[in-house]
Amino acid sequence: MKFSLATIALAAAVAASPTNPPAGAGNCNVKGKTGNVTCCNSAIPILGQLACNVLASGTCNSGQTAYCCDTGGNTGLINVIALNCVKLL
């Protein structure tokens, strides 16, 4: 039982560890405007793209995909920034 708990805890820690930063982490260009690099969970098709994290540390977590998002016009109560995003390669 203790071995199983230790193995699960180790697997969770490895899965949550950050990966290499995407090229040009921080600022990017969307349709001629300066945008921000965000990390979205690609494992959940729709909800994962709506719940994107603005890249502050320079790395995305394992299982996340880097997107360049235009955040210039998002001033409402609900910011749907995934609609203004372009996937980075």
Swiss-Prot record:
What range does the record give for the signal peptide?
Answer: 1-16
Statement: the UniProt record of this protein carries the keyword Disulfide bond: yes
UniProtKB keywords: Cell wall, Cytoplasmic vesicle, Disulfide bond, Glycoprotein, Secreted, Signal, Vacuole
Question: Transmembrane region positions?
Answer: none
| Induction comment from the UniProt entry of this chain | Under normal conditions on SDAY medium (Sabouraud dextrose agar plus 1% yeast extract), hyd1C is consistently down-regulated. Hyd1A is the most active at transcription level under normal culture conditions, followed by hyd1B, hyd1E, hyd2A and hyd2C in order.
Q: Where in the cell is it found?
A: Secreted; Secreted, Cell wall; Vacuole; Cytoplasmic vesicle
Glycan-linked positions: N36
Q: Which domain of life is it from?
A: Eukaryota
- Result of knocking out the encoding gene: Does not affect radial growth and multiple stress responses.
Statement: the UniProt record of this protein carries the keyword Repeat = no
Report disulfide bridges, numbered on this chain: C28-C68, C39-C60, C40-C52, C69-C85
Q: What does the UniProt record say this protein does?
A: Aerial growth, conidiation, and dispersal of filamentous fungi in the environment rely upon a capability of their secreting small amphipathic proteins called hydrophobins (HPBs) with low sequence identity. Class I can self-assemble into an outermost layer of rodlet bundles on aerial cell surfaces, conferring cellular hydrophobicity that supports fungal growth, development and dispersal; whereas Class II form highly ordered films at water-air interfaces through intermolecular interactions but contribute nothing to the rodlet structure.
The family note in this entry says:
Belongs to the fungal hydrophobin family.
Protein name as it appears in the record: Class I hydrophobin C
Which species is the source of this protein?
Beauveria bassiana (strain ARSEF 2860)
Q: Which gene encodes it?
A: hyd1C
